[in-house]
Amino acid sequence: MDELSILNELRKYRDMDLDYEDGTILGSMCTKPHPLTRKISEMFFETNLGDPGLFKGTRELEKQAISMIGNVLGNKDAFGYIISGGTEANLTAMRAFKNVSKKSGKSLNIIIPETAHFSFDKAKDIMDLNVIRPPLTKYFTMDVKFIRDYVFDNPNKISGIVGISGCTELGSIDNIAELSKIAVDNDILLHVDAAFGGFVIPFLYDKYKLKNYRYEFDFSLEGVSSITIDPHKMGLAPISAGGILFRNNSFKKYLDVDSPYLTEKQQATLIGTRSGVGAAATWGVMKLLGTSGYKKIVNDSMEKTYYLTRKLREYGFKTAIDPVINIVSIVDEHKNETCAKLRENGFHVSVSRCVDALRIVIMPHIEFEHIDIFLDCLSNTKRY
């Protein structure tokens, strides 16, 4: 095949895909990347951070991107990597937990909530984690009293806690401040999965913060050991651009393996060959948007989230919880059936595991008119 024929054939397949701008993708935590990232992607498309000695400039951009994210998270001296996404980030954190526990002689008992992302199920399978599931409060956050009592009743047997800041299904935020105190008092590692919330919570206006939640989650809390945060979600970087940050580089020794045939003799990330596009694009978008840009993006999405919630109630629908961030859960005992019918009508939503509800994520590509059309479709779907 010649080049033009190949491109024409590829276009046929690309045209089968959905486009974010159509406003029909309502269940994804990704969105259309910032236009600047097209140029950055072309500039860095052949770089490989898996062999950083060959791409020293790209590696320096990664370090600066981590420092900028760390600054958002209360610690510009944080150590970490721009990697494939939240799954790899969470696996990396659990791998560090495992190796720290091995050195300290603790059993690999980790407290992880039911609201955690499915990547922790993968971590459990790969690393043979013993997972303790605490009960949830009515706000779908971990019961801190249960955790405190459990740790007290099982001294030196808990090696780590995972808290969620912006849970995938509902957007709820665990009380990381209290979990931090428990971690410090008992010499326990604390990982925060803020894959989605990390580029939302720091930029939220106070008027959108609910009194039932503690919004602190970052390295300003002494007990936080590591944080997952994805620039390719609300950070507007292209896929794949996930992030794993540790409080300091003392965790590196728990991740390193020998890599004698590369330009650096030790390697820490789960994926060896890593495109430099994610790191460069994260650097570029963060430099361009800055705090004011992200505040506008986040709070525009929150305004639309509140609009959707208000209109849902006018239509007679209920939400499982008031929106904590830009995620809305629509109570529906027949969630899977409704989800399938909506998909037949062109709207792609998802469902929650921990509650009977449809799950809507209001990303920057969603406009008010998209919400109105969706509401009419949902209302008609539930009428029959």
Curated annotation (Swiss-Prot):
State the needed cofactors, names only. pyridoxal 5'-phosphate
Pathway where this protein functions:
Cofactor biosynthesis; methanofuran biosynthesis; Cofactor biosynthesis; coenzyme A biosynthesis
The entry's keywords: Decarboxylase, Lyase, Pyridoxal phosphate
Please give a single GO biological process term from the UniProt record. coenzyme A biosynthetic process
Q: What does this protein do?
A: Catalyzes the decarboxylation of L-tyrosine to produce tyramine for methanofuran biosynthesis. Can also catalyze the decarboxylation of L-aspartate to produce beta-alanine for coenzyme A (CoA) biosynthesis.
Do you know which HAMAP family this protein is assigned to? Answer: MfnA_decarbox (MF_01610)
Q: What is this protein called?
A: Probable L-tyrosine/L-aspartate decarboxylase
Q: Which gene encodes it?
A: mfnA
